[in-house]
Structures are given as C-alpha cells and as structure tokens.
Amino acid sequence: MQSAARQLKLFSDTEEPGESPGFSVRESGRAKRLSIKVYPHGRVEVVVPKRTRARDVQSFVDEHRDWIKKTRASFAEKHPPQPFALPFRVRLAAIDRSFRITYRPVRASTNVRFRRHGDLLVLTGKTSDEKLCVEALKRWLAALARQEFEPWLRSLSALTGNSFRRLQVRGQKTCWGSHSSSGTISINYCLLFLEPSVVRYLMIHELCHARHMNHSRRFWQAVGRHEPDYRQLDRRLGDSWPQIPGWLGIY
C-alpha cells in the first residue's frame, strides 16, 4: 500500500470554494496522531503517523478546513507577502555578524558561484537569474552554518554528555533540527538568523534525543537539566519562522 504522503499530492494554495485547502503530507515515525501545521506565509503541512491511509488524511483536513482558512487569513494579515528582492546585506543574529553582498555578472556564464572576503560576499556568474543567485546564497549559508555550528554542537555534546555521529546541515522547510536513530543530527541553516540562546536550546534539544528518541517526561527533564528556560525558548523557536527572509523561499 502506498503511503499517504505519496498518494496525496501538493495542492495549490488557491483552492476553489468548497475544496480542501492546499496542503502537503509528511510522515513521521514519532507522530502518534494526525496534526496540522500552518506556516506564516500560508503553507499547510499535515503530519501523520506511518501507514496512515490517504483517505483518513483527507477527512482530517476536511474536518479542520475552517480552522486552516482562519489561521491562514490571520497569518496573511500579520505577515503580508513581500515583493521578492535579492539581498544586498544579510544580518545573522546567531553569530552576531553582518555581510554585504555584491553581484557581478559574467558573460556566457550558466551558473552562479560565491566567494567570501571577510564580511563581503561576492556572487559571480549569471547573476541575472534570481533562482541561481538564491541557490548560491543557500550554499553559502549551509557552508557557514557548518563552520559555525559544528564546534558549538561538539562543545554542547561534551557539556551534556550526549554524543552524535555526524552533523548534517540542510534547509528544511518543516523543522529546525532532528536527530536520527543512526546518530545523525540535522540542523537547519536558517538558524543563523535566530538569536544565540534559541540556537543553543535547539542544539541541546537534539543532543538529548541521543538518549531519549521521544518527547517523554524523561526527555524534557534531560533538556531542563542543561537549559532550565527550555519552555520559553521552545515557544520562541516555534514562533521564529517569520524571522527568515522571504527570498530564501523556506515557507
């Protein structure tokens, strides 16, 4: 039997009256029940336990159609869509640094490369192609996140006594981080835009999954031993998506 995630495709965000809101489906081994997430720019994600039937997902979404539409409308009012524009300056709160960005076109080039000179980032190539520029900026953020976050994560690993096998840096659209059963910690490079205290909490959270691959009472007790203010930081982390610049296209 195909999974719900494979059977249900991503619907458009401009559904016809009477139809279900557009949504994507993500299967989670940790999920015990179906849940719906609405992101600031209107994207809707349904998180389901493994082996959930597609028709059950559709029924669940239909049940919550009014709530989804109200939530999306509320987000649209608070976070109106901004016109797309490539950045010329980027502020990364997590590492307390700002970077200037310049774009240098190269005739006949078919790609865009980046090179960093201190706090200046230079993109060269087919810079008239905004998509290629954004992809280059994402590669730069991923490389910088690995450079900055790996020593930080290893330091917290020693502090908490929780180990990990390797670090993976990605640009996930659905989560800030994860810890696999094989010991791989995945961290979202968008954390570079958040405050250091929130990033530190996320790292401690994922490291504590080395001993508790769930969100049980023991897990939260472990987190609390190393970050007493975890409840407030967890709420701040969950509310942080609007801090990510729109040109990244993350949500």
Model regions and ranges:
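Active-site-proximal or metal-binding-adjacent scaffold patches in catalytic folds
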Residues: 1-201, 210-251
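Walker B catalytic acidic pair
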Residues: 206
